[in-house]
Amino acid sequence: ISLSCPCTDRGWTCCPKGWRRFQGSCYFLSLDRMNWTESEQNCTGMGSQLVVINSKAEQVFLSEQIRQTKEPKPDNFYIGLFVEKVGQWQWVDKTPYNVTAAFWRKGEPSVVPDENCVIIHRDTELPNNWNNVRCLLHHRICE
């Protein structure tokens, strides 16, 4: 996040080039792919973190931004939700995980060993398009 953009009580008033603004936050959708740990480190290096989704409006906005992304058509974007312990989900900023404010695809989250990271999937019906996956190479959303 650029220091030349003033932060007010309503959040950021502008966003760095290549970032998208929504309700006082700035978001970066990557076109390159990294594993989850590298993705979080990349976001941190830009003064942000993997996105923490706090509302249905934010979830729908991000899903629409993914669908509008042109060539190459990226499918899966990491968010800042991960398994801390088996069956226990944790946001990167320690926001409490709330199952009623989660947007899982039908049949998700699956109880599969090693599927400890969460992505938003491009082609799933809105707003429920989260999927837990192995923490391999995917795109990312920084906030």
Show which residues each predicted segment covers:
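Extracellular, disulfide-bonded carbohydrate-recognition/adhesion ectodomains
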Residues: 1-143
